[in-house]
Amino acid sequence: MKKAVILFNLGGPDKLENVEPFLFNLFYDPAILNLPKFLRYPLAKLISNRRAPTAKKIYEELGGASPILKLTIDQSNSLENKLNDEDQNNEYKCFIVMRCWHPRAANVIHEVKNFNPDEVILLPLYPQYSAATSGSSIKEWHTVCKKNDYNVKTSTICCYPTEANFIDAHIEEIYKKIKDLKNYKLIFSAHGLPEKNIKKGDPYQWQVEQSVNKIVNKMNIKNLDWILSYQSRVGPLKWIGPSTEDVIVENSKIGKKIALVPIAFVSEHSETLVELDIEYKELADKNGCVEYVRIPALGVNVNFISSLSNLVINKEDNKLTENLYPPKIQCPSNFKKCPCLNYE
């Protein structure tokens, strides 16, 4: 059988003149701005126009473009090779779909149709599910399929916050950086969300907590000083916390070394390479931090690629039901945005 694996990620501008249209695509997403289209369009234009100058400075730090597509291609190639090595009864081909920049679903679907798979497997590169990330990408894919009258067996791997190899991949990368550190604060930093999203039933924060708890318990380091915090807050709304910035300032001032783990990002991009590596390091230095280390995103870590491969290959063994994996509901029932409870 031929199987197409669709890897979803956010995307990023490939040159400075595309920063503003990238931002427009981000804010025009109804999962980000939940407004009627006639209001969402002008507001997205306004926000993207106002934020473009600051965002361009960020991408100038990265050489004028986001590295996320190249890094996702590396992940895609590694996963495709792993899948075809591990399961020689099927032929796998991986495709990349970015939500806010190229390659977009509307273009990639034609490549998928040319491959003519017996099954399409949707695999977000977001380990923890949120309606604003995985949910938005999955929804767009189904919309594009409907527009193109494309009907094929489709399975969805919605999330994998506690998958064993995913956890091991993080532990491996953390150990490399902390093995010689003393008197440090281990900070797990995830992208934040407005508090109202969580109150409406988005399982993201709960799933991030499950990831971190699993890692900390498996590391089993006596008296490990750790915390989970959230970064990248924008706008006037109240966001989930504590904020990574506040945690860095507080611990730098009391003489703690900082070890920072990007727990919800699996590839490097502006929010790791600029926000974590430059802006937050400057913040730590300014407040007296004597040493600041940043654990890398998982990238093509062997355990992480094995995690993705296991999810794709073993979903049948785990009795995939109603085209959604994981088969057992992981999230408590109050998280109504969890696709296992209420697929959108």
Language-model segments: residues:
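Active-site-proximal alpha-helix that buttresses catalytic centers in soluble enzyme cores
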Residues: 1-344
